[in-house]
Amino acid sequence: MAFAVSVQSHFAIRALKRDHFKNPSPRTFCSCFKSRPDSSYLSLKERTCFVSKPGLVTTRYRHIFQVGAETGGEFADSGEVADSLASDAPESFSWSSVILPFIFPALGGLLFGYDIGATSGATLSLQSPALSGTTWFNFSPVQLGLVVSGSLYGALLGSISVYGVADFLGRRRELIIAAVLYLLGSLITGCAPDLNILLVGRLLYGFGIGLAMHGAPLYIAETCPSQIRGTLISLKELFIVLGILLGFSVGSFQIDVVGGWRYMYGFGTPVALLMGLGMWSLPASPRWLLLRAVQGKGQLQEYKEKAMLALSKLRGRPPGDKISEKLVDDAYLSVKTAYEDEKSGGNFLEVFQGPNLKALTIGGGLVLFQQITGQPSVLYYAGSILQTAGFSAAADATRVSVIIGVFKLLMTWVAVAKVDDLGRRPLLIGGVSGIALSLFLLSAYYKFLGGFPLVAVGALLLYVGCYQISFGPISWLMVSEIFPLRTRGRGISLAVLTNFGSNAIVTFAFSPLKEFLGAENLFLLFGGIALVSLLFVILVVPETKGLSLEEIESKILK
């Protein structure tokens, strides 16, 4: 699923930023969205609030995965300058003061991606009589599916559980707990004496994913200077893709070692420890402290003082400096306004009515097809697929997986560069067509072309490349654009849960279905679903390129 997370923030940032210049109405300024985690996945009650002057227009962002930088009430893209909280000029800062508050939360994303890449090699090692180092290596397809998807089910549970406690915990404590869960999950999985303990470790690790993918984008967005917020959030998502590549790479080095799967999963331990110690050294989010004050959880002046101390520490300024005091005063006003605005929102059932239902059909359909065309299987089972596709040596299969990871990273940048130039529909239609072709090629390889392993490699590269320019980023860009303002947060919440749930199911079902149907028929099935998704894109998905959020609602959702 992270799988789709590599550049979601970047595209949402660009889409929302565009509307400011085209139609800077009060409604545009109040645009809000929830982002994914990818995935990860923020509470409906969560938001980050910023004030833009003049006019003191308040913008609220409801997050599920992406958070962006604001400029004049909208998001600022990488490197662009946005209004500060305190004045019309950008907030002054030193890069040295923002590196650690970015790096430590971003490690949560890297560990998420790492699990995807490492699992690809670990499944080969675990099932090898010679390399597993265990007596319980002979997994059934269902058991293998549970091992691979265990972290995803844990992430789903974590993302649901955090809804009720996120405001109480705060972003810093949430990320510390996530690091502890990552640490325990890595240790338990790496040292597991049997399958049951292994599954417990996978579940705990996944629970950490759910918390980290919720807390990390919030902490980064709420603590970094506004003019670089978009850059840092985009880099945070890039950490997930780098994590996937790192997992593939570690797998390729450890695949020939007896019990190498233990090292693959255990590698997350020192990274999780670094993340936990790093978050422990950082202060709480100043905006979260102000939110607690607005919620009536303590004395206003006490929370304001804590927020000023936290902001001063984050910026490397003396405690209680005047700049931090002014920033906190302005931030408190925006948090209070946004909190009161949240109370006046519509009820949950509105998502299933009128134009909202049309938006849910478009957004929910895209994230559903994103997963059921087999995308999770290609990443989690890349090593196994390559091994059955002619690279019988586990080392060869894992090394080719690294090539796939590098190609995925490169195609991510292609998508970033072209999505606003070419539009959503052309990239979706072309990309999904390529996905269908690649799946049919994989089916043909297993059925007719077994003597040509390069066909399988080419098909996998084609799949990854086409996914990265279509479903991967554009599904979440469309989701961030398509919902009407009043129901945007709730609609994107449903889209995120649809994505996470379908991802877990597809990942679990791949191994049993491969055993039951055969690889050639399974990829043929995925190819057929890809054709259905192509038809869905052609008939249902509109072009939103160049349209403001208001124009999307008035012209497309009428």
UniProtKB/Swiss-Prot annotation:
GO molecular function list: transmembrane transporter activity
GO BP annotation list: D-glucose transmembrane transport
Membrane association type: Multi-pass membrane protein
Domain of life of the native organism: Eukaryota
Keyword Isomerase appears in the UniProt entry: no
Entry-linked InterPro entries: MFS_dom (IPR020846), MFS_sugar_transport-like (IPR005828), MFS_Sugar_Transporter (IPR050820), MFS_trans_sf (IPR036259), Sugar/inositol_transpt (IPR003663), Sugar_transporter_CS (IPR005829)
Keyword Iron-sulfur appears in the UniProt entry: no
Transit peptide: 1-31
SUPFAM superfamilies associated with the record: MFS general substrate transporter
Keywords: Chloroplast, Membrane, Plastid, Sugar transport, Transit peptide, Transmembrane, Transmembrane helix, Transport
Location relative to the cell: Plastid, Chloroplast membrane
Listed transmembrane segments: 98-118, 146-166, 175-195, 197-217, 238-258, 264-284, 359-379, 400-420, 426-446, 449-469, 491-511, 522-542
Family the entry assigns: Belongs to the major facilitator superfamily. Sugar transporter (TC 2.A.1.1) family.
Name of this protein: D-xylose-proton symporter-like 3, chloroplastic
Species this protein is from: Arabidopsis thaliana (Mouse-ear cress)
